[in-house]
Amino acid sequence: MKPHDSLISFNGFTVLLGSKAEQQLIFSEIKEQLLTSERTDVMIVQKNWPFFPYLNLKEQVFLDISEKQKKSKQEDIQSKLMIDSSCLKKAVDELNTFEKIKLQLMHAILAEKTNLIIEDPIDDLSITEIQDLLVHLCDLVNEFSFSILLLTHDLSIAESPYVHFCKEAS
């Protein structure tokens, strides 16, 4: 049994605090666990979102989302996450890290992925974006019953009032 086998089981808004090296190791273990797992309710949110080269951004965001789901929830979710409609018309290389994260969160809501594992995006975000992200993540937990595991090295994030649980990575 690996030391981090329970990492894909978490509740509320949980922060896993550790160095970047520890995060990389844990993130690799989580990916490996998910590949061998039958869980379909988990999504990994990455700052360097891997895109399918043959899809445009809108197709990427709505991949595997039914038309019914898309039509019934898209506008409401875009509004909640403060995603401008012009964002979906951008080229992938025009997106900043915060836009990529918000689009992945929108996909997670539409795809009904209720467990999110988020790779540390903090170094690539402004203070305002970090504050907005924490509010969005807390809203996902409270409004959509999501469970979120955020890997970070930033102690101020771990001590945020939005965070329910904090664990040391080691």
Region roles according to the model:
Residues I109-L116:
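A short, proline-enriched helix->beta-strand linker immediately N-terminal to the Walker B motif
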Residues S37, I130-A158:
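Conserved catalytic loops of ABC-family nucleotide-binding domains
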Residues L105:
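Hydrophobic anchor residue at the start of the ABC signature
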Residues K2-S37:
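Glycine-rich P-loop/Walker A and Walker A-like loops and their local beta1-loop-alpha1 context
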Residues D41-F52, D154:
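Catalytic "switch" loops of ABC-type ATPases
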Residues A91, I117-S126:
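Walker B catalytic motif
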Residues A91-F98:
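Conserved ABC ATPase signature
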Residues K47-M82, A91:
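Q-loop/switch helix immediately C-terminal to the Walker
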